[in-house]
Amino acid sequence: DGQHWQAKLVRSLKVPSQPESCVADDDNGTLYLGEEDEAIWRFAAEPDAATTGEVLVKADGKALVADIEGLALIKHQGRTMVLVSSQGNDSYLIYDTKAPYQQLLHFRVTTNPELGIDGSSETDGLDLTQGSLGVGFSQGALVVQDGRNRMPETGQNLKLIPLEHILQLLPKTH
């Protein structure tokens, strides 16, 4: 009737320490899981699949710096990529989801003094859509949580970034 639903636990997944975020790729039957201080993991998403995962990429303390927080998927030019927030250095990385899991992009959301908008920092979560949101966001948007709002000096907020700005920075596929 649309008012009631039930769920049944079909399996449990585990990583060595604290899981922080996850995103599912329905097209490829894969679940990506961020382990806060350590790595991004890849698991088969089917209910009867194994419960062991594979490390996609480890936090290296240089580009990907703990805490590993939000995860989202980007599908572009026939490629599926995972976007991750690297809280320890206030940045974002995009990795190919196919081995050898190459880092494709590393970027920051920086201050725009002309518009009075500060950059993002201490991101705990993010998400994106690749559907058009109208003028300025025709290819979608990335939304990131900003833990320290500096312009003006107030509580945390969200930053909305046109996805086409990020897609333009990605290396072209061959």
Range-by-range predicted roles:
Residues D1-H174:
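Sequence/structural signature of beta-propeller domains
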